[in-house]
Amino acid sequence: MAIKGVDISEHNGSVNFSTLKNNGVEFVIIRMGYGSNYTNQDDKRFAENVKKAEAAGMPWGAYLYSYAKNTSMAKSEAEHALRLLKGKTPLYGVWYDVEDPQLSGVDVVATSQTFCDAMEDAGYYAGIYASLSWLNGSLNSSKLDKYDKWVAQWNSSCTYKKAYGIWQYTDKLVIGGKNFDGNWAYKDYPSIIKAMNGETEEEDDEMLTYDQWKDYMERYEQEKAKEKVSSWAKDAVEFVQKEGLMNGDADGSFRPQSNVTRQELAAVLKNEHDK
């Protein structure tokens, strides 16, 4: 199972979600912002893109670009994400984008743990976005194995050896004349996250037991029995009663909307034969 998606930020400008859907895109991961918890570091189109995705019925995830050089900065980045996510439901998870050259030599294992743990503590599904070289290098730690991975490798195949859920395979996916980062997701994230949050899919229809069905049919017949004979059939009903061809129900009534059963037809034919 591979699900087609894109990731977007303010750098993509105004995104037409109908065009995305018409080109087979089924999910989008939206940048929240970058760095520590300052409003001037919010992505200027985050709220707009979330609103558009939800209006289009497209599940979305979110990511924050990291500049954290220590766990204190990572905590601020987590606060940044949580502020922007308040009241929202990212069904494709929350991702920590670790790729900036300034992070060379930083303990990115510790900063990634800090951010992802804060997301999970808040009830979100957390993962790490990074290039193949970062994942095989500075981020290659068993401490991070419990977090999902979103692998950036612009190639014909993903060669990351550990488990991952999303592969960003290109930065040149052209849709509607615009360039996007193209992604394949290999997990049903909406189902996973709904289950994590205790949500279940409700059945549209419930099966009736035999007793429930029987009770329903009896009440249905009772209501139908209250209906009067249609005016166009009144003469015919009076005739068959007078001639003894049909007697109706036990109380002499006729159910105008009911089907004639085989046993009722047999009674009519017998009455005619006996004459």
Which residue ranges define each predicted feature?
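Glycine-rich, charge-decorated loop segments at or immediately adjacent to ligand/cofactor-binding or catalytic sites
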Residues: M73, W134-L144
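Substrate-binding cleft of extracellular glycoside hydrolase catalytic domains
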Residues: M1-C116, E120-Y125
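Short, solvent-exposed alpha-helical surface patches in non-cytosolic proteins
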Residues: D204-K275
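Short Gly/Pro-enriched loop/turn and capping motifs at secondary-structure junctions
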Residues: P101-L103, S133-N136, N155-T159, D171-V174, ...
